[in-house]
Amino acid sequence: MTVVGSGVGFWALVVVATLVGLFTAWTLGANSNSPPFAPAIGANAISTMRAAFLIGILATLGALTQGGSISETVGSGLIDGVAITSLAATAGLLTATAFMAFGVYSGYPVPAAFATTGAMIGVGLSLGGTPAVDTYRQIAVFWALVPPVSGGLAYLTATILRRDDIPETVGVPLLAALVGGIVANVRLGVIPAPSGADQGSIAGLVAGVVRTPTVAGVDLGAALVTLLVAGASFQFIRRRTQESVDQGVRTFLVLLGSVVAFSSGGSQVGLATGPLENLYRVELGLPGIALLAVGATGILGGAWMGAPRLLQATSREYAQLGVRRSIAALVPGFVIAQAAIALGIPISFNNIIISGVIGGGLAGGSAGVSRRKIGVTVTFWLLTLVTSVAVGFVVYRAFAAALGV
């Protein structure tokens, strides 16, 4: 292992940067992981404390097994020509955390991904780096597509669940089949990828072990595993709904909340660990899993210590939404979060859920959807991105001047 730098100042920055990263992860664990189980609590399918416990465990597992791609993007993909130093990482994390804290205490919608992305671009430019325009273009397109795609999927889901000619003993199991099929193809760091990629999926692993032909670019083995998992999911929830519709829906809410919480951890941890990528993996020579473990620890602490209070508040809101609209909001959240993880795109999980809630609300009429609130939300998203770039730039320059770097 090669350690770059050995002075007291260097190690002091390592400690400070790590502590700030832990606090950022704690904040994300407390604030970004409550939506998955809120509908289940509102439907009396699970208690608040048990939900908080599961959120912590599942989000931590998601962070450890899926957090690497977004962490790498935040740490090295936003700026070209320079490496993020420990001082720059500290400045970027402090800037992003300050924006998140402002959002929590003011009540204004401040997306964590926008704040972190902007802050890291700012400190990178302050270091003398050049903008990674291609990466910005990919991120911008993905972010722009999130509201219509999440809202559209939620609208479609809510519409299907509201149709009288589609009984809940069919509609809910069909959604379970969709989720199960996606789970079979979720990329996990603990599963070896036959293609040599960093992460593999259950379907991909089976396809690599059992040789099957490929038709139109689709591996039949992977497709068969996907169909089997989807079919098993459909049959399990269908049996539950046939015994009792309410019990079946509650079971689906808990299982859906579980996979969404897992995805939330995988999509959010990179916002806390990304700025530390160069410090841990290059300067300290540590493996990526060590850095993800730091972030996962923060998310676990935040979920267990901060989530119960937020769960009680959000569960009341989801109870007012109703079961159908709650499911409609969570299904797109799972799909889009997994797409972001696969592409390495930093994303704020709450943004996806907000768009899903709006889409589900439109399925029942637009009376509950405030255009003014939507406008204020989008405005603050854009303001967060722009101002975090400027603040990150200034904060790093101030730190560098104060320390004589």
Give the predicted meaning of each segment:
Residues M1-V405:
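Hydrophobic alpha-helical segments
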